[in-house]
Amino acid sequence: MPYQYPALTPEQKKELSDIAHRIVAPGKGILAADESTGSIAKRLQSIGTENTEENRRFYRQLLLTADDRVNPCIGGVILFHETLYQKADDGRPFPQVIKSKGGVVGIKVDKGVVPLAGTNGETTTQGLDGLSERCAQYKKDGADFAKWRCVLKIGEHTPSALAIMENANVLARYASICQQNGIVPIVEPEILPDGDHDLKRCQYVTEKVLAAVYKALSDHHIYLEGTLLKPNMVTPGHACTQKFSHEEIVMATVTALRRTVPPAVTGITFLSGGQSEEEASINLNAINKCPLLKPWALTFSYGRALQASALKAWGGKKENLKAAQEEYVKRALANSLACQGKYTPSGQAGAAASESLFVSNHAY
C-alpha cells in the first residue's frame, strides 16, 4: 500500500481551495491575456500594428482597465511574464490593477511545446526546470494561479499512448510544483480541433486523455480542490463535413467530463479553441443549461473569444480606446451570463464576433 507523506498542510490546502473558488465564483471566468510575444505579434499584425513592447503594454492595459462593469465577470486574468512586470499609465503595476477590480492574478509558466521523439509529430511541453524558483518569485510578485498548456492532436494514429502518458505526467509535475508554492495550477490538456474527425471520436479521445490526466494527478498527490481544469469542448474537427447541433456538442462535452473529472475539482474553465466569440458564448451557455448533474463550476478561460472584437475596434489607434473597451465589456458580460446559463444571443453580434478564430496547429 503506498504511504502518503503529507505534501501540503491544512493551511496550504485552504489557501489553494479559496483561490480556486474566487476565480470561478458564480458569474466569473478567466481572461486569458497570456499570449507570448510571438503570438501577440500575429494579433497585432492582423490590425496593422507593430509588435513593440509599448503597443503590447497599451493593448493589455486597454483590457485590464475596462470599466467596473467587468468586475463581476472576470475572476482571474492570466498574464505572460512580460505583462506581470508592466505598469498602467498611472504607474500602478498590472497585478495591482487586476486585484483592485476583484480579480486574481495568473501567470503562464510553461516554455512552449517541443517534439516528442518517436511519435508522428506529437509534442510534450517544456518548462519544469527551475519552475519551483519561478513560482516562488511569481507568488511574491502577486500571482496566485498559473497555467500550463499541453497539446494533443487527433489523427489516424494519434494521440499515441506515449503522448497521452507523457503529457499527463508533465501536467502532474507542474501541478505539484505550483501547489508547493501556494499557486493554484490550471491543468490544460488541449486536444486541437484540427482534423476531419467527427464528434464521437473527439469525445472518445477527450475521455482517454482526461482519465490519464487525473490518474497522473492522483499518482503525484495533487490536491484536486486546489486545481482548475482547462479543457477543450468536445467538437468535431474543423475539416469534418458532418454538421452537429449545439445540443450534441453539449451532451458529448458534459458526458466526457462526467466520466473522467472527479467532483472534487473546483472548476472547469473551457478554452475557446478557435470558436467565434458568439459560438463560444452560446456553447458555454448551453453546457450550463444541460440537465445532467454537473458538480463543478463550468465557466470560461477565453483569449481570442474575449478579445477579437476589441482588438479589431482598437486597430492600434489610441483614440479608439473607449470603443475597444466597450467591445471587450460586451463579451465579458455575455460570457458572465453564459456561465450561469442565462445568456440570450441578441442576434446582433458584429461581424468580428461571428468570425471563426480557428488557427491550424495553434501554438501560444
From Swiss-Prot:
Q: Which InterPro entries is this protein grouped with?
A: Aldolase_I_AS, Aldolase_TIM, FBA_I
Q: Where does beta-D-fructose 1,6-bisphosphate bind?
A: 43, 272-274, 301, 304
Q: Where is this site: Necessary for preference for fructose 1,6-bisphosphate over fructose 1-phosphate?
A: 364
Is the keyword RNA-binding assigned to this protein? no
Where is it found, in Gene Ontology cellular component terms? I band; M band
Q: Where is the active site?
A: 188 (proton acceptor), 230 (schiff-base intermediate with dihydroxyacetone-p)
- Per the record, residues carrying Phosphotyrosine are 5
Q: Where is this cross-link: Glycyl lysine isopeptide (Lys-Gly) (interchain with G-Cter in SUMO2)?
A: 42
Q: EC number(s) of the enzyme?
A: 4.1.2.13
Q: Which residues carry this modification: Phosphothreonine?
A: 9
Glycyl lysine isopeptide (Lys-Gly) (interchain with G-Cter in SUMO1) cross-link, chain position(s)? 42
At what positions is N6-malonyllysine found?
111, 312
Role this protein plays: Catalyzes the reversible conversion of beta-D-fructose 1,6-bisphosphate (FBP) into two triose phosphate and plays a key role in glycolysis and gluconeogenesis. In addition, may also function as scaffolding protein.
Q: Provide the assembly information.
A: Homotetramer. Interacts with SNX9 and WAS. Interacts with FBP2; the interaction blocks FBP2 inhibition by physiological concentrations of AMP and reduces inhibition by Ca(2+).
Record-given protein name: Fructose-bisphosphate aldolase A
Species source reads: Pongo abelii (Sumatran orangutan)
Q: Which gene encodes it?
A: ALDOA
